[in-house]
A protein has these predicted regions:
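Conserved donor nucleotide-binding strand/loop of the catalytic core
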Residues: 32, 46-76
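Acidic helix N-cap motif at the loop->helix transition within catalytic regions
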Residues: 21, 43-52, 92-93
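Structural signature of the Rossmann-like NAD(P)-dependent dehydrogenase/reductase core
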Residues: 8, 38-41, 121
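A conserved acidic beta->alpha catalytic loop
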Residues: 26, 38-47, 61, 84
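Residues at the starts of beta-strands that form the adenosine-phosphate
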Residues: 6, 32-33
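N-proximal low-complexity "stem/linker" segments adjacent to membrane-targeting elements
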Residues: 1-26, 256
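Catalytic-site signature of metal-activated, phosphate-bearing donor transferases
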Residues: 66-72, 78-83, 90-253, 260-261
Length: 261
């Protein structure tokens, strides 16, 4: 058995017992530490994680970004691999990470790699969803969680190496689960636009959905992913249209409160 790498997996979870065997199973035998921060679990998430040797910490929900910040603060290992419960380190990525640590990792502060989504029975390898380069491996103390509530990301000062192995992502097991996210992300978008004081624009409402479809399906070759590629481009365009339409709705409700009551 090879020695474990000086890496801690940092993860947050709520009712992820069904996903943890895949995600933690892909790393448990070669990382030094697993830190899982949980909240409000009712499905045995804690017990499943402990079966993989994870340190499980219960912490009240603070939102995705801040919850991940708390999890990161609990890590002791020299390096951190930040994962979501619905992700899996592929064999190719595992090999790349091992090669990185047995090679030139001392010259870098972190590493990024492509994230590949399993959707509608196939891997998505084109369009807006791929390669989705993700910075997830970094020196402890050098990276921190930043970004917006729905698009949190690691920010890092220093050089970053690109690895080629894919991080597998099982984020949308059904069409229903994807459609539900349109409303959730629409809420975040509306809140951000209101905070910025940005007015509704008819031009953006009409043109942005068209552009998002054209970019995903044509420029980024989404058509090569068959019907799933077409669905993703269409759904992205529709989600964009809904977001800007909700901004219009909010302005109407603000300007005419008595009529919208």
């Amino acid at each position: 058995m090879s020695l474990k790498l000086p890496i801690a997996v940092s993860m947050i979870a709520r009712n992820e017992a069904h996903n943890l065997p895949r995600s933690l199973g892909s790393v448990a035998d070669w990382v030094q530490e697993i830190v899982l921060v949980v909240n409000d679990c009712t499905d045995g998430t804690e017990e499943v994680a402990q079966g993989f040797g994870a340190t499980v910490i219960t912490h009240p929900w603070e939102g995705y970004r801040d919850q991940k910040r708390f999890a990161l603060a609990q890590v002791k290992a020299p390096w951190v691999l930040a994962l979501d419960a619905d992700e899996e380190v592929s064999e190719a990525l595992k090999a790349d990470i091992h090669a990185f640590f047995h090679g030139d990792h001392e010259w870098f502060q972190g590493a990024m790699f492509p994230r590949k989504v399993w959707f509608l029975g196939r891997w998505i390898t084109h369009g807006d969803w791929y390669p989705d380069w993700s910075l997830r491996l970094f020196r402890n103390g050098k990276g921190h969680w930043s970004g917006s509530p729905e698009h949190d990301k690691i920010e890092l000062d220093g050089s970053v190496k690109k690895l080629r192995g894919d991080l597998h992502h099982y984020s949308n097991p059904t069409l229903n689960s994807h459609v539900e996210k349109i409303t959730v992300f629409g809420d975040y978008f509306l809140q951000r636009q209101i905070e910025k004081g940005r007015p509704w624009s008819l031009a953006e409402t009409l043109l942005r959905p068209w552009w998002r479809f054209f970019r995903a399906y044509v420029l980024r070759l989404g058509f090569l992913d068959g019907f799933p590629g077409y669905y993703i481009a269409r759904a992205t365009a529709f989600a964009t249209f809904v977001r800007y339409s909700r901004l219009y709705e909010n302005e109407q409700q603000t300007n005419h409160p008595s009529r919208s009551a």
